A protein has these predicted regions:
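Short beta-strands and strand-coil junctions in structured, solvent-facing domains, enriched
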Residues: 11-14, 71-72, 87, 173
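Buried hydrophobic packing residues in well-ordered domains
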Residues: 5, 21-23, 39, 64, ...
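M16/insulysin-pitrilysin zinc metalloprotease superfamily fold
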Residues: 50, 54-111, 179-185
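M16/MPP (pitrilysin/insulinase) zinc-metallopeptidase core fold and M16-derived inactive scaffolds
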Residues: 26-45, 56, 87
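C-terminal regions of mature proteins
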Residues: 86, 104-185
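His/Glu-based metal-binding/catalytic segments typifying zinc-dependent metallopeptidases
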Residues: 1-34
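Short beta-strand-to-loop capping motifs
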Residues: 7-9, 66-68, 168-169
């Protein structure tokens, strides 16, 4: 079963986009992330799980995706919501620091590819009408605090899922309304 939760997030001009990206990275940006460790490694509820934050001109979206079995979809969905709620109170400074390092490493490593560099320059020019320096971007990433990420996590929990998509045999999956109720509790 393919499972996706999506939440409205900041647009690309909103300074909170860096907070959203750090939140998504800490929650599901790799093997050391909270969702990967708790849901995949500790509980074995899925074979893949990740989170990401995307931004557009007038809105943004933070999504969580997991691939699981029909037998595990209900438990996976509920534990995902529980981890989102927990992040609002116990996202650690170490998790945020690790996410910051991961984002900066990705940014710097992306500069090694001419096509990535060209795409970055074009994207930044179209968004900002200028090209912010790497140092400016790194400073924005470094300025995001653990408190900022916890506040963003609380905001996500308080605005219970905008959308859910399921593909596959998911008859035992909780409804979006059930997940919203669990998130708001």
């Amino acid at each position: 079963v393919h499972f996706t939760l999506a939440f409205e997030g900041p647009n690309y001009r909103d300074p909170d986009i860096y907070t959203a990206q750090i939140y998504a990275t800490a929650m599901g940006g790799g093997m050391s992330s909270r969702l990967f460790q708790e849901i995949r490694e500790n509980r074995g509820l899925c074979y893949t799980i990740f989170a990401q934050a995307g931004a557009y001109e007038d809105t943004g979206m933070t999504t969580i995706y997991a691939g699981t079995s029909a037998e595990e979809i209900e438990n996976l969905a509920n534990v995902t919501i529980d981890e989102m709620k927990r992040a609002a109170s116990d996202m650690s400074a170490a998790e945020v620091a690790r996410a910051r390092v991961q984002m900066k490493a990705g940014l710097l490593m992306g500069l090694e590819s001419p096509s990535n560099r060209a795409e970055r320059l074009a994207r930044l020019l179209s968004i900002w009408d200028r090209i912010p320096s790497i140092e400016e971007t790194i400073k924005r990433i470094d300025n995001v605090t653990t408190g900022d990420v916890r506040e963003f996590a609380a905001h996500m929990a308080g605005h219970a899922g905008s959308a859910m998509a399921l593909y596959g045999p998911a008859s035992s999956a909780p409804s979006l309304d059930d997940l919203r109720t669990r998130l708001a509790a």
